[in-house]
């Protein structure tokens, strides 16, 4: 299946903010590190028939480059350094780093190369896959249907929050990677801009064009890579946290907690890290139990939770966000990142549950052992056992 009408992507900045944030840190600290990442479809979709169309889009991505107005805009943000931005100006996607095949109906994608370059593929490539699949499966759906669905949800949201003080409710768009299309994401974000509680988007291109605040810090791959970069597996998570503060000592300070479970994270998140990081992000497991653990940890360390922010971003919709806000709003600062349930929530359209995750660093395995066992990713069972032992994780978690 080939011949999609035109390139899906139009800007190098059509990606999640944390990709550039991590890329700058990799550029400065791990310039020569090599990695491999692989695509996973967590659902039962047979996407192999789209391999040729995806390959065409991958080839087209080599023509994307940072435009002058984009360069100037990034230069005005407080956390990018000139050496990185000048390098990014010359960056081009290398399609040779991407292997796309149809494996008996299943879509197989493997990315290999320098981490500083491979890091850029994940989000736009997932967005390409999502848009291509929905283009062929749901050719009559689009912006109008998405906006109609959103308006209906906003009516329910208004009723649901009528008795609440919403002044501390903050919602962000996290919907790039699994969006129905670029046009749908833009339309949804423009509509949400009318709401006082909408504070920004993870998409740098949309943030620039719509004058929004770009949102994001780091992803699982930052912690995963340190499992092989760090000389000691047991201290690799602390090494990742410290390296991030070295790059961003006073900003972008929301730490992701579930690369090796929340409990293992909190054992590493002592008073110095807890004081310097502005907050934590939830991405798997029971969100209420996670939030209670986070608040208890801050209190145990003598830190007022109201000075910290909890970001919830795991499979959220507006109703779940309100439920969490009701539970936690008086005790801690809160933000909510909603993705698929904003940018691909259209009647009769089945969103894709797709990811691209790091599987190797410098030729050796890395793993993610999240608080949702179904999200665990690693080929090497021996490494998973070593990781569990290093972080004192008693529960056996299936590697998939």
From Swiss-Prot:
Q: Which reaction does it catalyse?
A: nicotinate + 5-phospho-alpha-D-ribose 1-diphosphate + ATP + H2O = nicotinate beta-D-ribonucleotide + ADP + phosphate + diphosphate
* Cellular component, GO, one term: cytosol
Write down the superkingdom of origin. Answer: Bacteria
Q: Keywords in UniProt for this one?
A: Ligase, Phosphoprotein, Pyridine nucleotide biosynthesis
Where in this protein does the record say Phosphohistidine is found?
A: 220
The post-translation modification note in this UniProt entry reads:
Transiently phosphorylated on a His residue during the reaction cycle. Phosphorylation strongly increases the affinity for substrates and increases the rate of nicotinate D-ribonucleotide production. Dephosphorylation regenerates the low-affinity form of the enzyme, leading to product release.
Please describe what this protein does: Catalyzes the synthesis of beta-nicotinate D-ribonucleotide from nicotinate and 5-phospho-D-ribose 1-phosphate at the expense of ATP.
Task: Name the EC number(s).
Answer: 6.3.4.21
Task: Read off the HAMAP family from this record.
Answer: NAPRTase
Q: What GO terms are given for molecular function?
A: nicotinate phosphoribosyltransferase activity
Gene name tied to this protein: pncB
Statement: the UniProt record of this protein carries the keyword Phosphoprotein? yes
- Family of the protein in this entry: Belongs to the NAPRTase family.
* Pfam family for this entry, one: NAPRTase
- Entry's SUPFAM superfamilies? Nicotinate/Quinolinate PRTase C-terminal domain-like, Nicotinate/Quinolinate PRTase N-terminal domain-like
What is the official name of this protein in its record? Nicotinate phosphoribosyltransferase
Mind listing the GO biological process terms from this record? NAD biosynthetic process via the salvage pathway
Its pathway, per UniProt, is: Cofactor biosynthesis; NAD(+) biosynthesis; nicotinate D-ribonucleotide from nicotinate: step 1/1
